[in-house]
């Protein structure tokens, strides 16, 4: 038993030393190898359900289909007894609200029934559920220095990510398990000096088309740790 403890301690020491020497790019490759070992994201074609529960217990259920190979995206949302279906085919967009493509300006404003919002939601879901693979997209700037940091009493390897101005202005931090390289937390700031933005804790894993995706994402404000809600993937 004593020998096993010594071996494990030595393993952790060498693993930690190796992790400290990783560059941002090397860390990204290791976490992608954990989440998408067969490079399935490139031609991803599948669907999944996301149940969002806000802090005040409001529920929104979304059936999402992502077809990167054919540049298709669709989302069917049920909220407050209303059903919205959105489909994007390359640059074309169609919205159906409660079974009709015709709806009032009041409904359009209240339920955000615009193609601008549809493209925004497509980008949102393909980004978050495409992580960490999406960090290889053009315009992404990886900090070459990987840091070790404790977050909520747990130690992580942390990768800082910014973007070219044409892509985005937020600053992101991605927290990876130092043993498995699994992505377990991410955090973003609009203005880091103000401690704004949010952090998202990832729990459990669901495998979709060979890709390990987070089953539960819980959202909190950076400034006061206020709980905002969670998404559950099925």
Predicted segments, located by residue:
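Gly/Pro-enriched, hydrophobic low-complexity segments
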Residues: 150-234
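N-terminal mature ectodomain segment of secretory-pathway/periplasmic proteins
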Residues: 26, 30-101, 140, 147
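N- and C-terminal low-complexity/disordered segments
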Residues: 46, 60, 78-79, 87-89, ...
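Catalytic loop of the DD-peptidase/beta-lactamase superfamily, centered on the K-T-G motif
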Residues: 84-94, 101-104, 110-115, 228-233
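Intrinsically disordered terminal and processing segments
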Residues: 23, 30, 34-38, 81, ...
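Flexible, processing/modification-adjacent segments and terminal tails
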Residues: 20-26, 96-166, 193-196
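Short, surface-exposed beta-strand/loop "edge" segments at domain boundaries and coil↔beta transitions
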Residues: 54-62, 80-86, 101-104, 166-171, ...
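Bacterial Sec-dependent N-terminal signal peptides
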Residues: 1-24
């Amino acid at each position: 038993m004593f020998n096993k403890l010594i071996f494990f301690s030595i393993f952790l020491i060498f693993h930690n030393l190796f992790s400290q020497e990783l560059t941002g790019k090397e860390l990204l490759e290791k976490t992608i190898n954990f989440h998408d070992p067969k490079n399935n994201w490139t031609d991803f074609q599948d669907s999944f359900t996301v149940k969002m529960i806000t802090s005040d217990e409001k529920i929104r259920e979304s059936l999402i289909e992502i077809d990167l190979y054919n540049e298709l995206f669709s989302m069917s949302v049920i909220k407050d007894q209303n059903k919205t279906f959105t489909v994007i085919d390359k640059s074309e967009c169609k919205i159906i609200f409660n079974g009709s493509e015709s709806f009032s300006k009041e409904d359009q404003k209240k339920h955000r029934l615009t193609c601008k919002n549809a493209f925004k939601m497509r980008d949102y879901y393909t980004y978050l559920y495409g992580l960490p693979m999406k960090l290889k997209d053009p315009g992404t700037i990886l900090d070459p220095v990987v840091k070790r940091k404790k977050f909520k009493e747990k130690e992580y390897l942390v990768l800082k990510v910014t973007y070219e101005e044409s892509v985005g202005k937020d600053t992101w931090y991605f927290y990876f398990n130092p043993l498995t390289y699994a992505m377990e937390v991410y955090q973003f700031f609009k203005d880091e000096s103000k401690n704004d933005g949010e952090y998202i804790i990832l729990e459990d894993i669901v495998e979709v088309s060979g890709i390990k995706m987070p089953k539960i994402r819980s959202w909190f404000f950076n400034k006061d740790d206020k709980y905002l809600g969670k998404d559950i993937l099925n």
